[in-house]
Amino acid sequence: MAKKRIYEVAKEVGVDNKVVVQKAKELGFDVKNHMSSIDDAQVAKLKGSFQNSAPAEKNNKIKISVSSIRKNEKKQEDNAGSKKPRRRNNKRLQNNDRNHKNRNDRDHSANSGSGKPKAAALLQQFKQKQRAEEGQLNRQAQKAKKEYHEQLKYPKKEQPVNNKKKTNKESNNKKSEEVEKKVIGPKILKPSPARLKKNQPSTNEKPAVKVSIPEPPKEEKRNNGRGKNMGKPGHKGKNQFFNNHSEQSDRSERKRRKNKNKKRKQEQKPKKQITKRKERPLPETLVYEKGMNAQDIGKLIHREPAEIVKKLFMLGVMTNQNRSLDKDTIELLAAEYGINAKQKVHEDISDIDTLYNKRMEASKKSKNQVKRPPVVTIMGHVDHGKTTLLDRLRHTHVSAHEAGGITQKIGAYQVRLDDRLITFLDTPGHAAFSNMRARGAEITDIVVLVVAADDGVMPQTVEAIDHAKSANVPIIVAINKMDKPGANPQHVTEELMKYNLIPEDYGGDTIFVNISARTGQNVDDLLQMILLQADMMELKANPTEMAIGTVIEARLSRGRGPVADVLIQQGTLNIGDPIVVGDTFGRVRTMTNDRGRQVKKATPSEPVEITGLNDVPESADKLVEFKDEKTARSVGEARAQQALQKSRENVQHVTLDNLFDTMKKENMKEVDIVLKADVQGSVEALQQSLEKIEVEGVRVNIIHSGVGAINESDVTLAGASNAFIIGFNVRPTATAKSQAETEGVDIRLYSIIYKAIDDVTAAMKGMLEPTYEEKVIGNLTVRETWKVSKVGTIAGSFVDKGLVKSDAKIRIIRDGIVKYDGEIASLKRFKDDVKEVKQGNDCGLTIKDYNDIKVGDEFEVYEMQQVEPK
């Protein structure tokens, strides 16, 4: 039931708060002040009492009587000029001043300066006898009228001050309306001390209390000077006390009204509505994880943790907000809320192979796919012209600088034909590089099978066909060396038809092109066929996703750290992206394309060389980009830990089942080898080739393998294990070489893989009878280079150790890696040709068929000396 306060009821009936409080107490209501509350029934009863006791007619009669008082007042003022004030009136005025002094500020404000105790008594009597008869009210009005006239004739001394203040109040219409409302109520029975201004028209609409007091008439001013300065600010004597008292009363009155209006505005001001928190709806399914607590579940179902704890308590589960909940409790809680519960399945982010496949499948279904360049792998038997064909396409001379004239690592290049790009992968053709060819077939779109027209189908040719078919990759046959006299393309075609490679002329679907990589014959036709096959395949990729790719080769570079050649297959790889490559991780620091230029991003089908990994990855490892480095680091460390655990599990312990096999192996002789190579692919190929060597009673044991130059730790390990070191396209450091000579560790250096395999095989069979031994006779450092036409690059060098002979062989070493092995073309000191230059001297030399010499390169001069077999 709604309740109202006393001041609200007083405002509605237009009566003072104290009157309403008094009336409520008379009716038996339990109220104390104007802030007390009463119910609706009491409000109706209280309002009814005021309506019965003070009908509208009485107010109207009172208003009319006041109006008549004002009219009579004007007539009396017109006739007051000829009359003189009586002396007894002065005595009465003094009595009124005393009464006014004893009256409190509240009565002074309500009576507007009236000091008649009789008027106050009449007003109090009128309030207490509201149910009196109408005649009694009229008599009270007559008495009030009489007192009013007496007050006009004998004004108080402090009235001029009040007159000034009242005149200022007249300018405020809003305050005048408040005074008018007071006149209409019961309080108008009090006589007002104000005097009407002379010649100011009086209206029935304005109550008498609103009219300002006029100046005394001229006749009154001429009355022997009495009352001339009464009530003025400069008047001295007793009236000065009344003036100060009147001003103080006015200030307190204004302050009281100001506080009352402020309080009324605060009551009328609407209260701020407290916005209730909207409850979010429950989800249809709760996807939870094992070990979640009440706080975690509350965030998922949009409920407070305290509510969840209470709900669990009602279900008989005692817990708190931070205690982990089991699977059954979470499902029971979800059923209580009426929602389904489903446990979240965590994906193993360390399994980047699965992540790679998922991203590859998602990219194929994406709507943001665009055309990408085709990836073409050139495969075939060794020395059939694969690298020469690529040199013709790129206008380079890669094959001229390869050791033994054969490719021993995968190379990735891009060729532009008109406005289109083609990515080529050059794979080794030697039998030892079978895994490299298999990796090349897995990441390619098209395989170009190069077969020599004068040699026909060879074992590695058949192996390349098998790799391409197992990878489900289309094959384009390029019959090379058509410029040779013994070329027989028809014989080659017949041999390939045995392996289900039928040319289109014979009703098959395999494209055959007769070319000559040396002369460039039909090379453009081969490129056109590659683009035609790519258009039929509709090769597309999504460059907007995170990058994925495959490692082609990896190596350790001095000054740059681990370096990986990768092929981007989907997405775009940018500098600074966090990646995981195999068991390694890092952030892309630099990217270099096949032309040796720095690039900021790599798009699909683009091969790049990247740095920034924490270790050298394996060839064919998958590259996966992650959102942040923290995730990439955690995945990489987890994969490295798994690889370490797996390697420990491979260690076999002696049991009763394998005791005989273990004793048999212990009786076998082992050839312990420390293997170092320039790239990771060469390490794998050489290691697998050496482990496949079968000699009865002897087996190969690779105790360590890695990429980079041979260092002191490799020599220390070989000395402790009684092993020898095989270096493939790498050289030992100066410290490692000196340590090996001191400890008697044998270091064998090779640049052609089958020579290393033959030497190890001969050593295992005990038939190794070295006829020649390589002996280094001097070391040089390049300090300056000059390029001379028709001569080539002249290397100005300083002999650091030993001597240099003009007929010796020379090896170029850059960053610990062998760049070229050849012969000295010319040797000069100053401008004279010399046969040798000794240690501590400068010299100039040129190298036969090689001009890529840079400042800082190291030259190793050696001779092949014949030694007696041991």
From Swiss-Prot:
Function of the molecule: One of the essential components for the initiation of protein synthesis. Protects formylmethionyl-tRNA from spontaneous hydrolysis and promotes its binding to the 30S ribosomal subunits. Also involved in the hydrolysis of GTP during the formation of the 70S ribosomal complex.
NCBIfam families xrefs: IF-2, small_GTP
Domain of life from the UniProt record: Bacteria
Coiled-coil regions listed in the entry: none
tr-type G domain residues: 371-540
GO molecular-function terms, A-Z: GTP binding; GTPase activity; translation initiation factor activity
Organism: Lactobacillus helveticus (strain DPC 4571)
UniProt-recorded name of the protein: Translation initiation factor IF-2
Binding site for GTP: 380-387, 426-430, 480-483
Bias (Basic residues) ranges: 254-279
Biased composition (Basic and acidic residues): 70-81, 94-109, 144-159, 168-183
Pfam families xrefs: EF-G_D2, GTP_EFTU, IF-2, IF2_N
InterPro entries, per database record: EF-G-like_DII (IPR053905), IF2_II (IPR044145), IF2_N (IPR006847), P-loop_NTPase (IPR027417), Small_GTP-bd (IPR005225), T_Tr_GTP-bd_dom (IPR000795), TF_IF2_bacterial-like (IPR000178), TIF_IF2 (IPR015760)
Family note: Belongs to the TRAFAC class translation factor GTPase superfamily. Classic translation factor GTPase family. IF-2 subfamily.
The keyword Nucleotide-binding appears for this protein: yes
Region ranges (G1): 380-387
PROSITE patterns: G_TR_2, IF2
GO CC term, one of those recorded: cytosol
Region (G3), start-end ranges: 426-429
Keywords, alphabetical: Cytoplasm, GTP-binding, Initiation factor, Nucleotide-binding, Protein biosynthesis
Subcellular location: Cytoplasm
Region listing for G2, in residue ranges: 405-409
Region (Disordered): 49-284
Region annotation (G4) ranges: 480-483
